[in-house]
């Protein structure tokens, strides 16, 4: 019984224990659920309190994400465009002239000229011109602009003549200078070498009569090369017909306007057929005002090509220097550069005017430095011949007068005021009868710093700084052409040294520092830099006395005589001997243009050689022990042995020493006879 009671008491204990646990668990779970509900209710309450702030944040996040996505898309698009551009440039670099769609005969002529691949200007401009579009191209000098407009013009004429062989003037090429006209005409002849029967060209810049030009134009040449003034003169007279003109080209377009051809260009534009002339304009520098003027004259809707950024690799081969020096130091530095051969190779020296060019030439002659002068007073045939011979390596130094650089003055308003004041003064002088004598006639269509293709020029020296940064660009563009290396050296007169040396001072040098500042700013935009030209001034001073001796000998009278003498010689050569040299071309090589002009000038033999004591130590070591140097008073040949030989043999007029013979000298004492 006791056991049962124990069991009975045990059983309910076993049963009742989990019930109490369940109750405690339920109570704990209920408490937890209540706490969670409270926490949830607490967390929900602030969201319900600020729904607007969260929406704004969400909108901002979505907008930022969209902006980031758009930026990524734009960057990817730009990268794709760059990759496509690089790929297209690679593909374009592999193009040949036959791939451009030119006539096969022109491609054959191009191959004969040793042109391997088209340049960037040619790759971009030729397809546009062949498609009939107006092209306005801005590219650096020496980039092949001439072929870029000549080849599509010739190709279009050949294509037209295949179906319509009617002869008429199809193309008119306008250039600012006679020298450039001759160069373009020669390029046309070279490119049309295999189609001479189909293409006829003419140049209107020669000094011939109107009757000769009329007979030349009567055959209706396909291509005419001329300056605007000559072209309008022949159009106005009826000798040149432009009624069916298809192509118009302006080479060095900005210079055409700067040379004062505005009125001629406007007249030519009026005479052209409306809406049917394809226009191409080429230049290395084009200002917006000039663009607007030219567009108003000729272009409908031109395609702009600005290719200046593509030539950075070639620009690295052009090294630019400047040296700040006094006006007399210019002559000393020039003497040292050429006499000591600090710069080797063909050089172009630019000066401000013609008198200065001849003064520098006569100065160089004192030191036996040969050079030739290129200026507007020389006949056109002589100027062309000098350029050709320089390109063939006959001359090493050309001194070019760049009077035309004045037309690039950037402050046009002040320039117009000066011209108006000058016109008023001239009018007053004419009224009073006090006008000065008219200066020598100069060719208004002369220009050497623009467009002329000087070949293999090692250095360009700005003996006198140009008047504008634009003119500077075209001067230095004569060197470092077609991927070759070159040097540009500019001599700048500081404002505090201006006018200190009056015999060599000119007014143009007063603004040298301002022009240099403009040039440096312009070159900085093109990622180029002008560096100072460093040299040892102490060593330079040792040569100053020689420079002063030579400079004193070059007087104004000597300069005037040299100018008149060369003009007389060149006129005789150009007119009288022109036919003779055409019949005897081998004798043309004997006609040189770098001969001495200062025949009546005081000659100083000691200046023609540099003594070794003036040279630095390296120069002295270069002389060997056997080289004794220059002996100025040593006589050539043994005069003592030759003197009197004619007399000894009885020659007529000899100076024998008391020898017998018809021509010998007689001893007066031995032949003396006393009269009886």
From Swiss-Prot:
Q: Which residues form the Helicase ATP-binding domain?
A: 126-304
Q: Where is this motif: Q motif?
A: 95-123
Q: Which UniProt keywords apply?
A: ATP-binding, Helicase, Hydrolase, Nucleotide-binding, Nucleus, Ribosome biogenesis, RNA-binding, rRNA processing
Reactions listed under catalytic activity: ATP + H2O = ADP + phosphate + H(+)
In short, the EC number is: 3.6.4.13
At the top level, the lineage of the source is: Eukaryota
Query: From the UniProt record, which GO molecular function terms apply?
Result: ATP binding; ATP hydrolysis activity; DNA helicase activity; DNA/RNA helicase activity; RNA binding; RNA helicase activity
Which compartments does it reside in? Nucleus, Nucleolus
Q: Where does ATP bind?
A: 139-146
Q: Which GO terms of the cellular component aspect does the record hold?
A: nucleolus
Compositional bias ranges of the Basic residues kind: 642-663
User: Which InterPro entries does the entry link to?
Assistant: DEAD/DEAH_box_helicase_dom (IPR011545), DEAD_box_RNA_helicase (IPR050079), Helicase_ATP-bd (IPR014001), Helicase_C-like (IPR001650), P-loop_NTPase (IPR027417), RNA_helicase_DEAD_Q_motif (IPR014014)
Q: What is known of its domains?
A: The Q motif is unique to and characteristic of the DEAD box family of RNA helicases and controls ATP binding and hydrolysis.
The protein's name is ATP-dependent RNA helicase dbp-9
Question: What's the source species for this entry?
Answer: Neurospora crassa (strain ATCC 24698 / 74-OR23-1A / CBS 708.71 / DSM 1257 / FGSC 987)
């Amino acid at each position: 019984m006791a056991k049962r009671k124990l069991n009975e008491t045990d059983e309910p204990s076993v049963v009742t224990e989990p019930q109490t646990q369940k109750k405690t668990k339920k109570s704990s779970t209920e408490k937890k659920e209540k706490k969670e509900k409270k926490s949830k209710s607490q967390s929900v309450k602030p969201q319900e309190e600020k729904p607007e702030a969260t929406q704004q944040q969400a909108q901002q996040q979505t907008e930022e994400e969209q902006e980031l996505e758009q930026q990524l898309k734009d960057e990817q698009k730009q990268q794709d465009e760059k990759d496509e551009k690089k790929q297209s440039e690679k593909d374009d670099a592999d193009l040949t002239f036959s791939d451009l769609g030119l006539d096969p005969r022109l491609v054959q002529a191009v191959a004969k000229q040793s042109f391997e691949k088209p340049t960037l200007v040619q790759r971009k401009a030729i397809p546009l011109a062949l498609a009939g579009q107006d092209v306005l191209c801005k590219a650096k000098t020496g980039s092949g602009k001439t072929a870029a407009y000549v080849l599509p013009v010739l190709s279009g004429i050949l294509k037209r003549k295949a179906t319509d062989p009617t002869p008429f003037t199809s193309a008119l090429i306008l250039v600012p200078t006679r020298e450039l006209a001759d160069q373009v005409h020669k390029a046309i002849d070279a490119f049309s070498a295999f189609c001479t029967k189909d293409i006829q060209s003419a140049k209107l810049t020669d000094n011939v009569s109107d009757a000769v030009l009329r007979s030349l134009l009567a055959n209706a040449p396909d291509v005419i090369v001329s300056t605007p003034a000559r072209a309008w003169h022949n159009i106005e007279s009826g000798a040149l017909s432009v009624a069916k003109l298809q192509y118009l080209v302006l080479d060095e377009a900005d210079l055409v306007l700067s040379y004062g051809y505005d009125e001629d260009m406007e007249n030519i534009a009026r005479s052209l057929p409306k809406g049917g002339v394809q226009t191409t304009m080429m230049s290395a520098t084009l200002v917006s005002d000039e663009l607007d003027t030219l567009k108003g004259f000729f272009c409908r809707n031109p395609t702009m090509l600005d290719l200046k950024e593509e030539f950075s690799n070639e620009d690295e081969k052009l090294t630019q220097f400047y040296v700040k020096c006094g006006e007399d130091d210019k002559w000393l530095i020039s003497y040292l550069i050429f006499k000591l051969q600090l710069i080797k190779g063909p050089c172009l020296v630019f000066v401000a005017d013609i008198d200065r060019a001849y003064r520098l030439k006569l100065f160089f002659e004192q030191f036996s430095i040969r050079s030739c002068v290129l200026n507007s007073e020389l006949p056109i045939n002589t100027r062309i011949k000098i350029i050709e011979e320089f390109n063939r390596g006959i001359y090493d130094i050309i001194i070019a007068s760049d009077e035309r650089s004045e037309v690039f003055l950037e402050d046009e308003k002040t320039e117009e005021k000066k011209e108006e004041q000058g016109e008023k003064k001239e009018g007053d002088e004419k009224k009073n009868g006090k006008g000065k004598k008219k200066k020598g006639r100069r060719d208004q269509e002369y220009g050497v710093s623009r467009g002329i293709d000087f070949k293999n020029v090692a250095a360009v020296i700005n003996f006198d700084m140009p008047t504008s940064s634009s003119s500077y660009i075209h001067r230095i563009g004569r060197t470092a052409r077609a991927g070759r290396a070159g040097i540009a050296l500019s001599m700048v007169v500081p404002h505090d040294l201006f006018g200190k040396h009056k015999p060599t001072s000119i007014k143009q040098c007063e603004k040298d520092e301002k022009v240099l500042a403009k040039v440096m700013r312009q070159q900085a935009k093109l990622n180029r830099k002008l560096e100072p030209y460093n040299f040892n001034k102490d060593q330079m001073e040792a040569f100053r006395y020689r420079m002063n001796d030579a400079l004193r000998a070059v007087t104004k009278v000597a300069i005037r005589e040299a100018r008149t003498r060369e003009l007389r010689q060149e006129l005789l050569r150009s007119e009288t001997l022109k036919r003779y040299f055409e019949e005897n071309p081998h004798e043309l090589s004997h006609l040189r243009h770098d001969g001495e002009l200062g025949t009546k000038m005081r000659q100083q033999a000691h200046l023609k050689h540099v003594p070794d004591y003036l040279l630095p130590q390296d120069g002295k070591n270069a002389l060997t022990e056997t080289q004794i140097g220059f002996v100025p008073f040593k006589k050539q040949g043994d005069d003592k042995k030759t003197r009197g030989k004619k007399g000894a043999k009885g020659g007529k007029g000899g100076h024998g020493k008391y020898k017998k013979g018809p021509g010998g000298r007689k001893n007066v004492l031995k032949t003396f006879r006393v009269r009886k």
